[in-house]
């Protein structure tokens, strides 16, 4: 048995029957050819978007494919090919250092580049799908395929790579197109307010502001186990919002292009009185109600029980189902 304690940011002490890393497409293909994936398997990135509910009875695979390669460049933009095992925030830092615009609002999001393309990570008005041009993969038969971005089925925190039928499709590289021309996204959260503290706006300053905002709201997984936002913000028809506004006139919301609205799940959880509350060794964070934390010694089942209780409260008060953004393993 192999401990996965260092491979999940929730800090859940669970075990896998076997654990295997690979550092290249060739190594992955060799594992496949040797029959290593004939038993149950799970492919993970940085473990920052997982909750292990129990030990994993099978093989856990982890990519260590590295590298950031410029494949095309002109005066206006740059195309880069990035290994799935590159730490996401290291890639963001690299982009900012080189003056490439696009990733900066996604600073400090935990995890790795491969998982960013699977999950369609997003923050502060930016989603990674808007930067991706293609995703390179290998399937369980050892066959390589490149998915153009419009083949990836991207939606809010979703892609075709999350579907059960694509469980055996492994992301190996992600290709991005980034701008070399000044292009900022500032109208989200408290970004503009925080920028007033600085005499000018630059990429490094915006990255610092994003990091400061995140650190002020979100606990450090190295200190208190968590997986960032545990729940997705629900998207509802405008009619549902208007009905809720009768009872909750101050309910916050964000307009979407298709006429629907997104309601902050954290606000609803807070309205249900859960912020800062614990259920055994698991708790709702006292600064950001979207975040569930391991106060120490929690099992995955403890966090899941808290999640279920929070969801039931929101459903009872608002008539809305909120769903985990975190992937539940072993439920």
UniProtKB/Swiss-Prot annotation:
Keywords linked to the UniProt accession: Cell cycle, Cell division, Cell shape, Cell wall biogenesis/degradation, Cytoplasm, FAD, Flavoprotein, NADP, Oxidoreductase, Peptidoglycan synthesis
Main enzyme class: oxidoreductase
Source taxon at top rank: Bacteria
Record domain FAD-binding PCMH-type: where: 12-181
EC number, UniProt record: 1.3.1.98
Family indicated by similarity: Belongs to the MurB family.
Name assigned to this protein: UDP-N-acetylenolpyruvoylglucosamine reductase
Species this protein is from: Bacteroides thetaiotaomicron (strain ATCC 29148 / DSM 2079 / JCM 5827 / CCUG 10774 / NCTC 10582 / VPI-5482 / E50)
Designated gene of the protein: murB
């Amino acid at each position: 048995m192999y401990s996965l304690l260092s491979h999940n940011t929730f800090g859940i002490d669970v075990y896998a029957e076997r654990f295997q890393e690979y550092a290249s497409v060739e190594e992955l293909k060799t594992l496949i050819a040797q029959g290593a994936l004939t038993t149950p398997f799970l492919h993970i990135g940085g473990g920052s978007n997982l909750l292990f509910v129990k030990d994993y009875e099978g093989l856990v695979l982890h990519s260590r494919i590295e590298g950031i390669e410029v494949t095309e460049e002109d005066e206006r933009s740059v195309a880069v090919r990035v290994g799935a095992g590159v730490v996401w925030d290291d890639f963001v830092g690299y982009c900012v250092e080189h003056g490439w615009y696009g990733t900066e609002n996604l600073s400090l999001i935990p995890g790795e580049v491969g998982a960013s393309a699977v999950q369609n990570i997003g923050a502060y008005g930016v989603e990674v799908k808007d930067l991706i041009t293609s995703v390179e993969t290998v399937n369980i038969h050892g066959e390589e395929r490149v998915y153009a971005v419009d083949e990836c089925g991207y939606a809010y925190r979703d892609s075709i790579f999350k579907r059960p039928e694509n469980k055996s499709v492994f992301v190996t590289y992600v290709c991005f197109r980034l701008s070399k021309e000044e292009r900022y996204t500032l109208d989200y959260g408290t970004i503009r307010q925080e920028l007033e503290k600085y005499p000018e706006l630059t990429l490094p300053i915006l990255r610092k502001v994003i990091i400061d905002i995140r650190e002020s709201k979100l606990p450090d997984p190295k200190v208190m186990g968590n997986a960032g936002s545990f729940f997705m913000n629900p998207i509802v028809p405008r009619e549902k919002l208007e009905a809720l506004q009768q009872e909750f006139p101050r309910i916050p919301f964000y307009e979407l292009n298709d006429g629907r609205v997104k309601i902050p799940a954290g606000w609803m959880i807070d309205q249900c009185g859960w912020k800062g509350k614990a259920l055994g060794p698991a708790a709702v964070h006292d600064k950001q109600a979207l975040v569930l934390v391991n106060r120490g010694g929690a099992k995955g089942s403890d966090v899941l029980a808290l999640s279920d209780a929070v969801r039931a409260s929101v459903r009872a008060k608002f008539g809305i189902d909120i769903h985990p953004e975190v992937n539940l393993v072993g439920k």
